[in-house]
């Protein structure tokens, strides 16, 4: 039995199969995403979803889906599946599914009477193209396949409806057609590796619904355009490949291309290999720049997410060169920001006050994975520029006070990772001395001090250490309370006593102002009140305002976003903290905690981790189907565990 295998019983039960999604991407930000029964349930779903830079910086759904029909003796068996009004599903092709497997590539096996048909999909790595291979495993009479493409040509943020502006024109190309519904879009080429007949029958399929959007309180129906259908005969043992892309391809190359792409894939045959494959999906290369996307299907490259994710997505899977490529792009953005220049790359939210400190943390992980010497040679000047920028009080919203702590104004704007807003106002106004920002600050001071001292700059090292002494003393005085945990933020007489996970970073980081007893007290309360099988809760059930369920319309979800939901990426730092306290004796506990996350490999987005979970049982996955920080941090912990187990 393969690691990611789903049998007929699960597949034909839509309550079980529809919540499970698959995601495949290439390095340009394009992707294919749908459910494991190929029924689109989100406006973001599609067979071919690509960036169209001349229109905007969003992705666009070109080919929404492809309905297949098996024809024998004039009888038609449609394998497609769409949801329409009134919980009506048609044409119910899922009832023919015998099994689905995606350990290597997504493969669905259908049984229609005496016909056994296997469908395999692969998203090409280095171009915007999806290939689908149909193999007739068994048949006792002449068989024809019909392919009916459903076109959208719209942004993932919008819907399309029947209209007179959509072009119905098409042109024949070798073994297929090309078409483009609206100006500004690339042409869509749909071709087969075998001669076929295209029947031009333009039609709009009206009222297709996306239940995931309905759950989230958004509009949820659209019309999709079908230009006609392809028909091709297929023999027992024969394979036919359908290609959809934005450039023409020689049909004679399709078989070779498909096989080469398959050979290039790492099977998802374990927890680690699932996460490693998922890690590769967040990389986005645009000309000279290399980014990390925060998540799929709707996130872009956000600075904080990128720096938190970078070590886990690269160093933890032994891809140091990828780390350096991403950091080269990030370095340009950091230099732009420090110099007060417009940021000339697509990294968003560079001005958030913790971003530069997370960049230092990421480089600290690089130093640990390579060497301090290599880090100093490659990034020493950047680290010194960052620390000097903050110490000279040049940051727009990071103010170094005489007590050595950093102050940030978040009263009117969400400035940390807890960034939900309603009507333009932060749901959690974290302002003043913020606990993880100052933990990052202390860690950065000590790390850079050690780095530059080893490089011969004792004067700067002594200055940074002196600063850290002041910062560390104030940190304990300001944040630690009589109950042994840390206040979340402090602004004058205003103190946030909520039990939140942001204190765990102080225990996890290499350098901490807390002693071992103080660290253990923090770890104990986090374990007792915030730990779940899926991550750390963002708020203790004992604190006021606890709301563990991320459900309902946008506003309701925004209020719940960081008020009790559980986030897997925090588990990474929690496990690191646990191992710092308990060392070898903590390994078995950490390994047990990972079981709840490995269980997610066959749920939600198969082979990846979603954005967040409800904070109470059954801890249902919510939000974006695949989230970079979550995947990264669990990979980082798996790498850390491997070092302990040497």
What is the predicted function of each stretch?
Residues 277-285, 328-336, 599-606:
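Glycine-rich, acidic and aromatic/proline-enriched surface loops and short helix-turn segments
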Residues 273, 391, 398-401, 442-550, ...:
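Catalytic cores of carbohydrate-active enzymes
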Residues 79-105, 112-114, 392-395, 524-532, ...:
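Non-catalytic C-terminal accessory modules of carbohydrate-active enzymes
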Residues 252, 366-378, 447-464, 517, ...:
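Inter-helical turn/loop segments and adjacent helix faces that build the functional surface
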């Amino acid at each position: 039995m393969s690691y990611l295998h789903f049998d007929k019983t699960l597949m034909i039960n839509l309550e079980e199969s529809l919540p499970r999604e698959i995601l495949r991407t290439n390095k340009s930000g394009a992707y294919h995403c749908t459910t494991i029964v190929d029924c689109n349930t989100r406006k973001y779903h599609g067979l071919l979803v690509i960036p169209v830079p001349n229109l905007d910086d969003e992705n666009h759904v070109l080919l929404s889906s492809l309905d297949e029909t098996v024809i024998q003796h004039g009888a038609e068996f449609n394998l497609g599946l769409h949801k329409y009004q009134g919980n009506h599903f048609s044409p119910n092709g899922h009832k023919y599914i015998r099994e689905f497997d995606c350990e290597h590539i997504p493969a669905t096996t259908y049984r229609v009477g005496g016909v056994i048909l296997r469908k395999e999909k692969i998203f090409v790595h280095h171009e915007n193209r999806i290939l689908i291979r149909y193999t007739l495993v068994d048949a006792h009479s002449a068989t024809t396949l019909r392919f009916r493409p459903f076109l959208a040509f719209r942004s993932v943020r919008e819907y399309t409806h029947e209209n007179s502006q959509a072009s119905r024109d098409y042109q024949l190309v070798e073994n297929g057609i090309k078409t483009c519904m609206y100006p500004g879009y690339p042409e869509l080429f749909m071709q087969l590796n075998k001669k076929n007949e295209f029947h031009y029958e333009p039609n709009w399929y009206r009222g297709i619904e996306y239940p995931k959007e309905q759950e989230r309180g958004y509009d949820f129906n659209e019309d999709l355009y079908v230009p006609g259908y392809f028909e091709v005969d297929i023999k027992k043992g024969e394979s036919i490949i359908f290609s959809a892309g934005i450039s023409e391809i020689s049909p004679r190359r399709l078989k070779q291309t498909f096989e080469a792409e398959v050979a290039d894939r790492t099977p998802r045959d374990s927890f680690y290999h699932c996460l490693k494959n998922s890690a590769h999906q967040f990389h986005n290369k645009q000309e000279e720049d290399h980014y990390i996307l925060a998540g799929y299907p709707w996130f872009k490259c956000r600075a904080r997410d990128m720096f938190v994710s970078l070590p886990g997505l690269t160093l933890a899977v032994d891809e140091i060169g990828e780390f350096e490529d991403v950091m080269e792009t990030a370095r340009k953005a950091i230099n732009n920001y420090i110099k007060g220049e417009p940021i000339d790359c697509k990294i968003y939210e560079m001005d958030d006050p913790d971003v530069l400190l997370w960049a230092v943390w990421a480089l600290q992980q690089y130093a640990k994975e390579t060497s301090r010497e290599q880090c100093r040679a490659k990034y020493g000047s950047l680290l010194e520029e960052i620390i000097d920028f903050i110490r000279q009080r040049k940051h727009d919203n990071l103010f170094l006070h005489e007590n050595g702590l950093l102050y940030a104004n978040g009263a009117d704007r969400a400035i940390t990772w807890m960034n939900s807003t309603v009507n333009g106002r932060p749901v959690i106004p974290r302002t003043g001395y913020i606990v993880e920002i100052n933990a990052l600050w202390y860690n950065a001071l000590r790390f850079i001090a050690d780095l530059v001292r080893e490089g011969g700059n004792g004067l700067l090292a002594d200055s940074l250490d002196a600063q850290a002494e002041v910062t560390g003393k104030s940190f304990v005085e300001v944040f630690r309370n009589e109950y042994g945990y840390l206040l979340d933020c402090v602004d004058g007489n205003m103190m946030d006593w909520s039990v939140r996970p942001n204190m765990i970073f102080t225990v996890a980081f290499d350098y901490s102002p807390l002693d071992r007893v103080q660290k253990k007290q923090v770890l104990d309360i986090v374990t007792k009140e915030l730990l779940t099988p899926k991550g750390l809760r963002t708020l203790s059930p004992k604190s006021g305002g606890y709301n563990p369920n991320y459900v309902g319309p946008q506003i309701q979800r925004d209020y719940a976003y960081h008020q009790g939901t559980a986030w897997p990426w925090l588990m990474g730092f929690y496990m690191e903290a646990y191992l710092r306290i308990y060392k070898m004796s903590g390994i078995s506990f950490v390994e047990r905690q990972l079981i709840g996350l490995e269980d997610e490999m066959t749920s939600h987005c198969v082979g990846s981790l979603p954005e967040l979970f409800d904070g109470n049982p059954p801890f249902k996955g919510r939000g974006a189907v695949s989230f970079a920080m979550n995947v990264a941090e669990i990979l980082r912990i798996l790498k850390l565990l491997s070092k302990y187990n040497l």
